[in-house]
Amino acid sequence: MQAIDVAEFPAFLRAYRWINVNHASRGYPGDTFPDFPWIRSLEGRGVRIAAKGVITACPTDYLREILAWGAGTNDPRMKFEAGLGNVSLIAIIQQVVDNIHQPRAAIEASLQIPGFGLTYASKLLRFFDPTLHGSLDGRIRAALLKAEMLPKIHDSYASSMIDGYVRFHSLCERLISELESQSIARPECSMPFAESATGWRIADVEMALFAWAAKKDLQS
């Protein structure tokens, strides 16, 4: 794993930055270390939804908020709204929650949400269980592909997206093992620590990878 030096991960987490036009309209500043205000809010609510076990009320507005938080060049909100009448959204969310501890089954279920390609399907998993899941977005995908650490993912094939996410999840687990073996502690911030010696969750590793990928973009 020579392309990534985990000793840099604390600095990468501190360098994480995400902001779009929806932050201000929703009353949030940009998501930056150490507060990550919108991320922390989405994460807290997502964990509570998943912890219920049985979904009795469909969190449609919560999904809309995830789409608003992540809105970039490929904003899927119109596809989401247009597809709502064609699926039982509450049944899909129940399936996600039922399988949240099984990465392959969880991402397969999340991909059934209208407009939720791999980026947003994995974001939902990340907010439902940040200890176990991270978001695999286009920036991270491109950087890992260039570093030959993740295969090409074909978004037109569900099987490719599912396999790609499972590979990414395994990579994050290996990175956490390296962080643990080197006793590299996660910097203290507004988000909870994992119940481990170093405190890194997969979502934290993903955020560090996002900043790592941004650095790779600047260097290319």
Model-derived features: positions:
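Helix-hairpin-helix/helix-loop-helix acidic hairpins
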Residues: I55-P114
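Catalytic Zn2+-binding segment of zinc metalloproteases
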Residues: R126-H133
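Amphipathic alpha-helical segments within well-ordered protein domains
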Residues: R48-K52, I107-S110, L125, E173, ...
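C-terminal accessory module of base-excision DNA glycosylases/AP lyases that mediates lesion recognition
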Residues: M1-G44, R64, G134-S220
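A positional/architectural concept
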Residues: I39-P59, A68
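Short, solvent-exposed loop/turn segments at secondary-structure junctions
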Residues: A71, F127, F210
